Design a protein with these regions (language model features):
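N-terminal amphipathic/basic leader segments beginning at the initiator methionine
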Residues: 1-29
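N-terminal small/polar loop signature for handling phosphorylated ligands or for N-terminal nucleophile
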Residues: 43-115, 229-240
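A glycine/threonine-rich phosphate-anchoring loop and its flanking beta-alpha core
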Residues: 112-208, 299-302, 306
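C-terminal charged capping/lid subdomain of soluble metabolic enzymes
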Residues: 308-394
Length: 394
């Protein structure tokens, strides 16, 4: 049997209504003053105040920082770190989707060790434990509550940098499915397909193991069978619970098996054009699934049966059937048809022409090749291959 190592050094609560357990968990952490890092949407909905009130019920003070954008920047990390230091907080509550989670992890590093988040770019540059962190996701999702990554946009380089260190794993995670029912359909779709892609890329990764495969398979089954239902009705608590659990399993799976070309290529798209992360992944997925089909050794059939309403048997299955099923799923949940549409949907300055996009393909490919995920993609890729895949996605 193949040998492998794994460790999941976190305390994870998965329970409907478990936001109410925040005071108990904060007490376990020994915290007396929290900085809640969240987004403006949750603040407007009163959920940030609800979390702060829970903490106040056990005499834990809470300050808040909610000025967080999609694809959060180095500047946002600097502002949030300043807020943490000025407030006198001694732990962080990351409350929201992937953006608040990424910022909270980065703040936990910089507040403890100083400098800029850029000083910790790359693998294993965080010298030790960070500020204690409780993660409460409100999307399903990034899986950030169980991953050792923080992704931050450096606008000076049009580049999404990654901090990778097991030191930045949250000590505690609270997964309350009631929280994800507040997401708009577009957010539920983008986050849900992102979670599915985490599992899919981990599953076909050359670094996959029996452990990561088991988690990825369960994640794909949960998400694939529920994502249409959840996007159509976010108040469907059964579907919400399945999506949240699937996202959790996918996050753990890719923490061990890494990802692939989809994530390597989507980060530059978000850095150059501010396309939401999940949307960028989704429009690239069918193109890259087709490219990787030559390297399939039977796993595509499993993936297909997780997302297709009509199952297939091995003797009738062709890998291109999965590509078609992915396109059908993305259309059903409202994902843009191609990269050109996705970029224009995200544009704040008017129409972005195909020529303008094509002018960025080479620098995007250069940045994509810097990602460690390229190395574990099931089919080897050169820069010219990445450029070709971007063009196919247009």
């Amino acid at each position: 049997m193949e040998t492998f190592n794994f460790s999941v050094p976190q305390d994870i609560t998965v329970e409907k209504g478990s936001l109410s357990k925040l005071p108990e968990i904060a007490k376990k952490l020994g915290g007396k003053h929290a900085l809640i890092i969240s987004g403006p949407h949750l603040e407007k909905m009163g959920l940030v105040k609800k979390a702060a009130d829970y903490l106040a019920s056990v005499d834990i003070k809470a300050d808040t920082f909610t000025d967080i954008e999609a694809n959060p920047s180095v500047t946002t990390v600097e502002k949030a770190t300043a807020k943490y230091l000025e407030s006198g907080a001694d732990f962080i509550v990351a409350f929201g989707g992937g953006s608040p989670m990424d910022v909270a992890k980065a703040v936990g590093v910089v507040a403890k060790y100083g400098g800029s988040v850029t000083d910790y770019e790359g693998a294993h540059k965080v010298p030790g434990p960070i500020v204690p962190l409780i993660a409460i996701p409100t999307t399903a999702g990034t899986g950030s509550e169980v991953t050792a990554f923080s992704v931050i946009t450096d606008h000076s380089r049009n580049y999404k940098l990654t901090v990778f260190s097991y030191e930045i794993l949250p000590k505690y995670a609270i997964l309350d499915a009631e929280l994800i029912t507040t997401a708009p359909a577009s957010v539920a779709a983008a986050c849900g397909i992102d979670a599915f892609i985490h599992a899919e890329e981990a599953y076909v990764s050359t670094a996959a193991s029996p452990f990561s495969d088991a988690l990825a398979e369960k994640a794909m089954a949960l998400i694939g069978k529920n994502i249409r239902r959840f996007v159509a009705n976010r108040n469907d608590i059964e579907a919400a619970e399945a999506m949240m659990t699937g996202s959790l399993f996918a996050g753990i799976a890719f923490s061990f098996a890494r990802l692939g070309n989809v994530h390597a290529m989507s980060h530059p798209v978000s850095a150059f054009f501010d396309v939401p992360h999940g949307v960028a992944n989704a429009v690239l997925l069918p193109v890259i699934a087709e490219y990787n089909a030559l390297a399939d050794h039977g796993k595509y059939l499993t993936i297909y049966n997780d997302i297709s309403p009509i199952p297939a048997y091995a003797d009738e299955f062709e890998p291109m059937m999965l590509v078609d099923a992915i396109r059908e799923l993305c259309a059903d949940i409202g994902i843009p048809e191609n990269l050109t549409i996705a970029i224009n949907n995200a544009s704040r300055t008017g129409t972005v022409t195909k020529e303008e996009i094509e002018s960025k393909i080479e620098p995007m490919a250069v940045d994509a090749m810097k990602s460690g995920n390229i190395a574990v993609n099931p089919r080897a890729s050169r820069q010219c291959d990445i450029e070709m895949l971007y063009r196919r996605a247009l």
